[in-house]
């Protein structure tokens, strides 16, 4: 009986130290990535390991980091128009969108709608595994609060654009621009940026190089939203250009 208690005590001790260590790593990551490029994300690691485990050794999760000054302003505008139009104003969470999503999901349980902001998506993609669970969502909330506290909005947007998944093995807007349009991210047009943003909800299902009718329709909607937001002026007014 004593040995069992001792074993449980040691398990608790090392488990607690492990949790503290992970939290410390996350905190260090938030501080470091406030200034330095993010070399890889948890999503990239997960995709790479998944490919190797299935025998796909040709798969390479690829990303080319570029600063915001080397990204077309249309791209920043497109992802905000598509994913989070209140990004400059909220502190990581869009309460109105959350309430709307909860109401929708109660009525349509077969078609679940999310309400994650760009800040939440950035925190999740950089630091957490893929999937849906209350534990992961709770960690996402804490990490989102952390990056909103430490990073500027411009920094959050820069990291997001450099780690977002745009296709199979294609991460970051620079890799996407060169792969799909044979040009650097700085040269993306409004239409090209809107097309890239249109596949973000599910880049493994929706294809930039073979867009479905839905993707084309969403691209046109994003272009209209970009115009309604005010175009490049919207970025300048919110110090995001």
Curated annotation (Swiss-Prot):
Keywords: Cell inner membrane, Cell membrane, Cell shape, Cell wall biogenesis/degradation, Glycosyltransferase, Membrane, Peptidoglycan synthesis, Transferase, Transmembrane, Transmembrane helix. The gene is mtgA. GO terms for biological process: cell wall organization; peptidoglycan biosynthetic process; regulation of cell shape. The chain crosses the membrane at residues 18-38. This is Biosynthetic peptidoglycan transglycosylase. One of its GO terms (cellular component) is plasma membrane. Pfam families: Transgly (PF00912). Peptidoglycan polymerase that catalyzes glycan chain elongation from lipid-linked precursors. It is a single-pass membrane protein. GO terms for molecular function: pentosyltransferase activity; peptidoglycan glycosyltransferase activity. It is found in: Cell inner membrane. Its EC number is 2.4.99.28. Pathway: Cell wall biogenesis; peptidoglycan biosynthesis. SUPFAM superfamilies: Lysozyme-like. Belongs to the glycosyltransferase 51 family. It catalyses: [GlcNAc-(1->4)-Mur2Ac(oyl-L-Ala-gamma-D-Glu-L-Lys-D-Ala-D-Ala)](n)-di-trans,octa-cis-undecaprenyl diphosphate + beta-D-GlcNAc-(1->4)-Mur2Ac(oyl-L-Ala-gamma-D-Glu-L-Lys-D-Ala-D-Ala)-di-trans,octa-cis-undecaprenyl diphosphate = [GlcNAc-(1->4)-Mur2Ac(oyl-L-Ala-gamma-D-Glu-L-Lys-D-Ala-D-Ala)](n+1)-di-trans,octa-cis-undecaprenyl diphosphate + di-trans,octa-cis-undecaprenyl diphosphate + H(+).
């Amino acid at each position: 009986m004593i040995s069992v208690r001792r074993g449980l005590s040691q398990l608790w001790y090392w488990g607690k130290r492990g949790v503290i260590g992970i939290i410390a790593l996350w905190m260090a990551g938030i501080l470091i990535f406030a200034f330095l490029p993010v070399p890889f994300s948890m999503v990239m690691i997960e995709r790479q390991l998944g490919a190797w485990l299935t025998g796909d050794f040709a798969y390479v999760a690829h990303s080319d980091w570029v600063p915001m000054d080397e990204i077309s302003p249309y791209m920043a505008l497109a992802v905000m128009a598509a994913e989070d139009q209140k990004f400059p104003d909220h502190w990581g969470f869009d309460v109105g969108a959350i309430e709307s999503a909860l109401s929708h999901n109660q009525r349509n349980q077969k078609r679940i709608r999310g309400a994650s902001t760009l800040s939440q998506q950035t925190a999740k993609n950089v630091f957490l595994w893929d999937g849906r669970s209350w534990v992961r969502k709770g960690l996402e909330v804490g990490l989102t609060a952390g990056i909103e506290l430490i990073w500027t909005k411009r920094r959050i947007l820069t990291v997001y654009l450099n780690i977002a998944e745009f296709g199979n093995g294609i991460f970051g807007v620079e890799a996407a621009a060169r792969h799909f349009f044979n040009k650097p991210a700085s040269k993306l047009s409004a239409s090209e940026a809107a097309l890239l943003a249109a596949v973000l909800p599910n880049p493994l299902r929706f294809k930039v190089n073979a867009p479905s009718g839905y993707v084309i329709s969403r691209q046109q909607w994003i272009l209209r939203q970009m115009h309604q937001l005010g175009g490049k002026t919207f970025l300048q007014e919110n110090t995001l250009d």
